[in-house]
């Protein structure tokens, strides 16, 4: 048996990428839709979170889904996994604690996932007992430090801090947090906040809602998130109304930011902006200028748009945006805008671009070739590129050595239809599935990158020979139903520097059998934790 510690395997792993330095502008975002057809347990996403390791965790009704960058897996709770919370009236709320647990609250109940095993905890009560807490738990919270707090009766207990605070009898405790590791804040359903010294437990101050009408109007649910020297709070009404407020810890005053005639569902910060999911798309609040922007239509591929509610909105470690909807799937927008613009034949722009392309096509574009050749292109170096049924052929000198580029070199498809050279003398080819970019440096092809339907490239064949470089540096290619236009200089990968990666292994097979934690294979346990958390893998060898 061999023990492999601190694995650095890439061929066996599905990788999650690290932080990128390029960000998509909000108006340029294009979304990809994931749903049950992609492996999710359902077509709606109630909550979405990015773990510290970079993995996405999505709750659908009755399930927890994990996404590893290429596929979904989900786990299902059993009846005995559910713990009743008599004082929680809200909807789905996902929380992480400091003990590698994921907690999911929803309407008077909570479940717990052990992230080290990626399984539901059999009995939630056992977690409380392990933390030394034996009283019944009526509601559960986590603070900014991921410390657990349990409401039992009229007392809030810190399961990690070992502190306790009396709560008001005349108001519903809806949220809590800790400011600057020294002030305990209790947020109530009537819009008030009470502050206590975290260490001594002494009362510091209380601030109520601005008016009694406001206090009663938005009493249905509360969601609080820290920002600098204060807290943003969403308060929803039983009717379709909501208010966003900010509490300044220095002035100890509330400020109303916005009120809407529908529910606000989530908050996330990115690039000095506050993003809020709502019943009609999402809002962006500029924290520097106080400007507000409402995004009601979400752009999809092929010039389509979606109007939907947004239950949850988060950003991953790369800066990609994830949106959870009630019934229309999980939406993802890349951290950089798609450079591909497509125009269908019913769009007047398609005729415009066809005419521009037609004027700049080489004479070889119009020739009819016999199989297995679709097109031949001569670049500025005198190299001859041949688009074939079986790949892309390069001949640098007549009668010289030939090089064939296929799927093993980075093409997604080997039926090549058209070829064009950009202003920097790189080569772009259109295939029956995707557009590929061949980077050329020091008189050689250094790498190949391919773009497909997820990048807004039409998922269809392209027309033989129909590709041209325009005078402004853009490239036009013709597919069966679209004109595709893009600027090579707008691509995030034009920089030669590599982005930092944060690989995470999520699956391993032994003799074709998927390995699970604590599951024996040929008489011994290979991993004792979930693959994504494993630091040792034990396998037999000859």
List the predicted regions and their residue ranges:
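Asp-box/WD-like beta-propeller blade repeats and closely related beta-sheet repeat scaffolds
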Residues: 109, 117-139
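Short loop/turn segments that connect beta-strands within beta-propeller blades
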Residues: 68-71, 78, 114-118, 159-163, ...
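Residue-level detector of Asp-centered blade-edge/turn motifs that repeat once per structural unit
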Residues: 50-53, 96-99, 142-145, 178-181, ...
């Amino acid at each position: 048996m061999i023990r492999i510690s601190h694995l650095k395997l890439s061929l066996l792993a599905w990788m999650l990428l690290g932080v990128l330095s390029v960000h998509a502008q909000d108006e340029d975002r294009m979304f990809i839709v994931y749903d049950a057809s992609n492996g999710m347990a359902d077509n709606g996403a109630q909550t979405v979170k990015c773990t510290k390791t970079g993995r996405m965790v999505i709750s659908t009704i009755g399930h927890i889904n994990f996404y590893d960058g290429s596929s979904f897996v989900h786990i299902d709770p059993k009846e005995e996994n559910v713990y009743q919370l008599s004082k929680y009236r809200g909807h789905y709320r996902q929380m992480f604690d400091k003990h590698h647990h994921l907690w999911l609250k929803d309407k008077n109940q909570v479940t717990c996932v052990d992230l080290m095993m990626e399984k539901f905890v059999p009995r939630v009560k056992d977690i409380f007992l392990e933390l030394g807490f034996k009283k019944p738990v009526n509601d559960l919270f986590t603070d900014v430090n991921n410390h657990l707090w349990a409401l039992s009766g009229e007392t809030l207990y810190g399961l990690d801090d070992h502190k306790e605070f009396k709560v008001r009898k005349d108001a519903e405790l809806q949220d809590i947090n800790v400011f600057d590791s020294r002030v305990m804040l209790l947020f109530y359903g009537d819009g008030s906040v009470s502050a206590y010294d975290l260490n001594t437990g002494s009362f510091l101050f209380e601030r109520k809602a601005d008016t009694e009408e406001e206090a009663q109007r938005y009493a249905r649910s509360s969601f609080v998130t820290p920002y600098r020297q204060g807290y943003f709070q969403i308060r929803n009404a039983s009717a379709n109304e909501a208010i966003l407020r900010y509490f300044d810890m220095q002035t100890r005053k509330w400020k109303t930011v916005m009120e809407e005639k529908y529910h606000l569902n989530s908050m996330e910060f990115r690039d000095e902006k506050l993003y809020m999911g709502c019943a009609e798309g999402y809002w962006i609040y500029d924290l520097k200028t106080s400007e507000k922007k409402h995004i009601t239509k979400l752009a999809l591929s092929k010039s389509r748009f979606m109007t939907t509610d947004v239950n949850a909105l988060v950003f991953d470690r790369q800066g990609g945006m994830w949106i959870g909807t009630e019934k229309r799937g999980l939406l993802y927008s890349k951290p950089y805008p798609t450079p591909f613009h497509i125009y269908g034949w019913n769009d007047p722009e398609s005729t415009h671009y066809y005419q521009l392309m037609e004027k700049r096509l080489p004479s070889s574009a119009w020739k009819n070739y016999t199989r297995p050749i679709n097109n031949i292109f001569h670049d500025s170096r005198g190299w001859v590129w041949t688009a074939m049924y079986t790949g892309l052929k390069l001949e640098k000198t007549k009668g010289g050595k030939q090089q064939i580029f296929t799927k093993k070199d980075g093409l997604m498809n080997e039926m090549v239809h058209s070829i064009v050279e950009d202003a920097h003398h790189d080569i772009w080819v259109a295939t029956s599935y995707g557009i590929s970019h061949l980077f050329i440096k020091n008189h050689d092809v250094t790498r190949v990158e391919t773009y497909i339907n997820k990048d807004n490239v039409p998922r269809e064949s392209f027309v033989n020979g129909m590709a041209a470089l325009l005078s402004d540096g853009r490239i036009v290619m013709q597919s069966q139903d679209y004109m595709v236009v893009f600027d090579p200089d707008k691509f995030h990968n034009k920089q030669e520097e590599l982005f930092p990666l944060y690989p995470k292994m999520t699956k391993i097979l032994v003799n074709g059998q998927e390995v699970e934690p604590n599951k024996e294979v040929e008489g011994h346990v290979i991993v004792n934790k979930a693959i994504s958390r494993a630091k040792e893998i034990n396998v037999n060898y000859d």
